[in-house]
């Protein structure tokens, strides 16, 4: 799956959720990576900076963005603006994810499981701040393959886009919420 495909899925999710403006939401930002790149020209070296940022309100809204500029603060500001454009709402059930999910991007793969209350966010690298800023307090994850921050972030968002709450699953299956809870023994009451 490429970046275009993921961005299209994020846009579709935003439309499905009816997210148009996020001005009234207070976001917390975390800088995951700041990198300096150098372009050598006949006039000398030209430096450029890129920043990978995750934003979230710890109540279900989370997004990521990439910004590039000649100066670090400008690249971070651009990344935050990009993250606001890619913000989605994720389902939270008793502080954890509603069901097991696997996300992939490139050679990075993340497997996430719901956890009992008090477990905490067990995640490594770039995955932990995403789950924390989304508002999850208990979740178990494992990153397999590439640990590159860019790929891991996109793999996590691929997983988050696959999450469905019990009402959405019941609607698709044509069953009631109570039937699903009894049949599959899932979702805390």
Curated annotation (Swiss-Prot):
- Domain annotation S5 DRBM: ranges: 27-90
Q: Which keywords describe this protein according to UniProt?
A: Ribonucleoprotein, Ribosomal protein, RNA-binding, rRNA-binding
Question: What's an example GO cellular component term for this entry?
Answer: small ribosomal subunit
Q: Name one Pfam family in it.
A: Ribosomal_S5_C
User: What are the GO BP annotations of this UniProt entry?
Assistant: translation
Top-rank taxon of the source lineage equals: Bacteria
Q: Name one GO molecular function term.
A: rRNA binding
Query: Which Gene3D superfamilies would you find in this protein's record?
Result: 3.30.160.20, 3.30.230.10
> How does this polypeptide assemble, per the annotation?
Part of the 30S ribosomal subunit. Contacts proteins S4 and S8.
Described by its record, this protein's role is as follows: With S4 and S12 plays an important role in translational accuracy. Located at the back of the 30S subunit body where it stabilizes the conformation of the head with respect to the body.
**HAMAP family named among the record's database cross-references:** Ribosomal_uS5_B
- Domain characteristics, as noted in the entry: The N-terminal domain interacts with the head of the 30S subunit; the C-terminal domain interacts with the body and contacts protein S4. The interaction surface between S4 and S5 is involved in control of translational fidelity.
Query: What is the name of the protein in this document?
Result: Small ribosomal subunit protein uS5
State the organism of origin.
Hydrogenobaculum sp. (strain Y04AAS1)
